[in-house]
């Protein structure tokens, strides 16, 4: 008979992969139609002129142009000029 119970395997060691969120095009960069500007959870950054908002709150370009960010007291907006 064993004098010690056999050691079980660890139940730790799992973690989810990163979601690759964040700003993809910064202010002053050139965006083509359909290019992703921001990947986010919720609307931390809100869409303004010439940008669209996807189902998963992704902000993307509706027209070609220069990406521009604007901030008021509480919110941040992104547009294409």
UniProtKB/Swiss-Prot annotation:
SUPFAM superfamilies per record: Ribosomal L27 protein-like
Biased segments, Polar residues type: 1-11
Keywords on record: Mitochondrion, Ribonucleoprotein, Ribosomal protein
Stretch list, region Disordered: 1-20
One Gene Ontology term of the molecular function aspect: structural constituent of ribosome
CC terms in the record's Gene Ontology section: mitochondrion; ribonucleoprotein complex; ribosome
Location in or out of the cell: Mitochondrion
Keyword Mitochondrion part of the UniProt annotation: yes
Predominant subcellular localization, coarse grouping: mitochondrion
Any single GO BP term: translation
Family under the similarity heading: Belongs to the bacterial ribosomal protein bL27 family.
Protein name: Large ribosomal subunit protein bL27m
Species in which this protein is naturally found: Reclinomonas americana
Gene (name only): RPL27
């Amino acid at each position: 008979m064993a004098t010690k119970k056999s050691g079980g395997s660890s139940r730790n060691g799992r973690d989810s992969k990163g979601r690759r969120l964040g700003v993809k095009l910064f202010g002053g960069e050139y965006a083509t139609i359909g290019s992703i500007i921001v990947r986010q959870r919720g609307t931390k950054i809100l869409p303004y002129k010439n940008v669209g908002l996807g189902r998963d709150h992704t902000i993307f370009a509706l027209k070609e142009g220069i990406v521009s960010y604007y901030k008021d007291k509480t919110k941040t907006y992104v547009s294409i000029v």
